[in-house]
């Protein structure tokens, strides 16, 4: 019943446009496309989980950098967090319906502020769309993907949570 509907999306696809048209039968859609600007972002691809893990640990342990990690596999999250815990790196892992832990619940209530408390945040698709980390606490984003549990568009969204990061390091399992 709305007189006007405005949709803004950086990666809207034809399926979404078709759905919107089906909701507004007989109406002409006005589509405004804006050419993307070069934000000077770089993506580095790794041949294995171990290779990216080694790179990430070098940057965290030796260079004292902060990293936002995103994974589509709970086992990857557990592996990475176990290593970071063994090395006494202050970290938090946000995985599926596990917000019963106080620090996880607090993080999900205010990820922008809470993320500043950690050298490493390990996230999954459990962090809802619409979450944006706008501060410059994180030096880079690392993505560990199996390719079996999230769609490429979702992986893209997961990687883009930390808006100011220009450096992305990725492993995507080809099996």
Description of each model-found segment:
Residues 71-75, 92-106, 124-127:
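Conserved helicase motor
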Residues 141-167:
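Conserved SF2 helicase motif VI
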Residues 115-130:
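Conserved two-lobed SF2 helicase motor
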Residues 11-60:
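Interdomain hinge/linker at the junction between the two RecA-like core domains of SF2 helicases
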Residues 1-20, 147, 174:
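Conserved helicase ATPase motor motifs in RecA-like P-loop NTPase domains
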Residues 98, 109-115, 166, 170-175:
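Long, low-complexity intrinsically disordered regions enriched in Ser/Thr/Pro/Gly
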Residues 12-16, 58-84:
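Conserved strand-helix element at the start of the C-terminal RecA-like helicase core
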Residues 27-34, 87-103:
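Conserved RecA-like helicase motor-core motifs
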């Amino acid at each position: 019943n709305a007189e006007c509907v405005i949709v803004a999306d950086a990666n809207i696809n034809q399926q979404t446009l078709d759905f919107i048209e089906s909701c507004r039968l007989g109406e002409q859609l006005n589509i405004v496309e804006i050419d993307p600007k070069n934000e000077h972002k770089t993506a580095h691809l790794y041949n294995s989980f171990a290779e990216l893990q080694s790179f990430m640990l070098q940057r965290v342990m030796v260079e004292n950098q902060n990293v936002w990690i995103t994974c589509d596999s709970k086992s990857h999250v557990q592996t990475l967090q176990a290593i970071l815990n063994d090395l006494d790196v202050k970290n938090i892992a946000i995985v599926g319906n596990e917000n019963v832990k106080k620090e996880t619940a607090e993080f999900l209530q205010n990820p922008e502020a809470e993320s500043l408390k950690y050298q490493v945040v390990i996230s999954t698709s459990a962090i809802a769309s619409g979450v944006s980390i706008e501060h410059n606490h994180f030096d880079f984003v690392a993505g560990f993907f199996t390719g079996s549990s999230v769609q490429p568009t979702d992986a893209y969204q997961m990687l883009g949570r930390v808006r100011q990061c220009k450096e992305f390091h990725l492993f995507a399992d080809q099996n």
